[in-house]
């Protein structure tokens, strides 16, 4: 049996974001180009590979571009993918990070959205920026959104890795629920 290991040319694979539909597995991953020595997770975008059998992989390229140096999504980090039955569009919610966006001396994280009719060409929704209000949860840890449909409430839920306000750097980590 052969060994399967995917590595893009001139980059590293960050987090893997899986999605499955109609017999095809979609493996979004954080494409880390490591442009500068000893600099990790800078200029990160979402790239896509597809497979039906986990032996033959089809690289599709960049699916979500990052923003510019003045945008919240200078780096596009981990998130999740859903397909909305109402509009037929794919919706991706992902962590947006720019080390230059700071509050009280700490970098903040936010959530952005990308949509598309197919998974290969997703466009960031420029006016969607979801941030913590800084009352219950800290603004610094607001990341890794996971979105799913809740049948009982008939609405989408979003889970986020977060931190309860004023618990210190080593305490207070939690999962935030947004409806």
Positions of predicted regions on the chain:
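Beta-rich carbohydrate-recognition and catalytic domains
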Residues: 1-144, 148-179
């Amino acid at each position: 049996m052969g060994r399967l290991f995917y590595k893009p040319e001139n980059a590293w694979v960050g987090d893997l974001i899986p999605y499955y539909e109609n017999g095809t597995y979609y493996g979004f991953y954080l494409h880390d180009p490591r442009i500068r020595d000893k600099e990790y997770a800078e200029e990160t975008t979402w790239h896509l590979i597809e497979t039906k059998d986990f032996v033959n992989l089809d690289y599709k390229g960049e699916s979500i571009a990052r923003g510019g140096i003045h945008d919240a999504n200078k780096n596009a980090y981990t998130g999740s993918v859903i397909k909305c039955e109402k509009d037929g569009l794919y919706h991706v919610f992902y962590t947006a990070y720019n080390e230059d966006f700071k509050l009280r001396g700490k970098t903040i994280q936010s959530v952005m959205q990308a949509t598309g009719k197919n998974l290969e060409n997703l466009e960031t929704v420029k006016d969607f920026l979801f941030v913590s209000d800084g009352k219950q949860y800290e603004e610094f840890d607001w990341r890794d959104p996971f979105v799913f449909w809740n049948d009982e409430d008939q609405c989408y839920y979003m889970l986020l890795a977060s931190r309860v306000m004023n618990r210190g750097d080593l305490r207070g980590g939690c999962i935030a629920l947004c409806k």
